[in-house]
């Protein structure tokens, strides 16, 4: 494994968070994450405890478990999201990815959004929390408002998408997020990230975490093993 491949693996949220994700998918993600020392594996809550039994058995101490909260629509009551956070952490999660209440954002109820995010951050601490915007449904003003709220309440990351909407991370929407955050907190993308060219383009915008499927990660890792020069940004010390 070359150094570029190693560095890329530490930028990856390996994800199996579709409704059809199976035990075999979770096992495959655990195996791939262990082999490449991928930074995290994200699964649906019903698989969190199971995943936590796989990773130690495979000898890794550096692969985190991530779990979704209010997934995928964000419309769960805040109390429900808080309980989800507590259960995920009890089951082994070391990151939580909360879906913003999309309907409240579209309604302009930013006081609700702020309190929703704040309580999840509070419940998760010291485990870092991310907020998923589901940018497919939000306009520029809404994206900018939620980014500012995320910073205000102590979110560690802003994430573009769940992977369940018609579109995921796009250069246009990520550019808006990057412009609004200005490095105050980090950017995580997900949804439709399937090739090295896309990863490289988004990395240049400031993205430092990529939510990707097993197939997509395998494809990019294989390309980097053969052609590390195609991601020159990771070759700079």
Residues covered by each model-derived region:
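Short, surface-exposed connector motifs at secondary-structure boundaries
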Residues: 30-38, 127-130, 154-159, 181-185, ...
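Alpha-helix-loop-beta-strand connector modules within alpha/beta enzyme cores
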Residues: 45, 49-71, 108-135, 144, ...
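A general structural detector for well-ordered alpha-helical segments in enzyme core domains, enriched
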Residues: 25-29, 84-85, 113-120, 146, ...
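Conserved strand-turn element in the central/C-terminal portion of the radical SAM core barrel
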Residues: 99-103, 129-138
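Catalytic cores of alpha/beta
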Residues: 52, 76-87, 138-149, 176-183, ...
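Conserved N-terminal beta1-alpha1 strand-loop-helix module at the mouth
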Residues: 1-90, 140-145, 149-152
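Glycine-rich, proline-tolerant flexible connector loops at the mouths of alpha/beta enzymes
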Residues: 30, 34-50, 54, 96-114, ...
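Glycine-rich phosphate-binding active-site loops on the catalytic face of alpha/beta enzymes
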Residues: 15, 67-72, 90-105, 152-167, ...
């Amino acid at each position: 494994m070359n150094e570029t491949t190693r560095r890329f693996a530490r930028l990856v949220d390996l994800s199996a968070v579709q409704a059809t994700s199976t035990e075999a998918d979770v096992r495959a993600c655990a195996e791939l994450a262990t082999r490449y020392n991928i930074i995290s594996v994200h699964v649906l809550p019903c698989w969190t405890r199971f995943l936590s039994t796989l990773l130690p058995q495979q000898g890794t101490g550096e692969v985190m478990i991530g779990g979704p909260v209010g997934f995928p629509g964000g419309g769960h009551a805040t109390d429900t999201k808080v309980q989800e956070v507590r259960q995920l952490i009890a089951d082994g999660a070391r990151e939580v990815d909360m879906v913003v209440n999309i309907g409240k954002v579209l309604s302009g109820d930013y006081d609700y959004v702020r309190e929703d995010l704040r309580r999840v951050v509070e419940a998760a601490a010291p485990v870092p929390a991310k907020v998923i915007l589901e940018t497919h449904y939000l306009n520029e003003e809404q994206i900018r408002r939620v980014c500012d709220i995320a910073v205000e309440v102590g979110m560690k990351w802003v994430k573009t998408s769940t992977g369940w909407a018609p579109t995921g991370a796009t250069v246009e929407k990520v550019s808006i997020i990057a412009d609004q955050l200005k490095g105050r907190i980090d950017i995580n993308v997900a949804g439709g990230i399937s090739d090295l060219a896309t990863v490289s383009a988004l990395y240049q915008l400031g993205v430092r975490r990529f939510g990707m499927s097993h197939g997509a990660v395998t494809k990019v890792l294989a390309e980097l093993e053969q052609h590390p020069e195609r991601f020159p940004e990771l070759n700079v010390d």
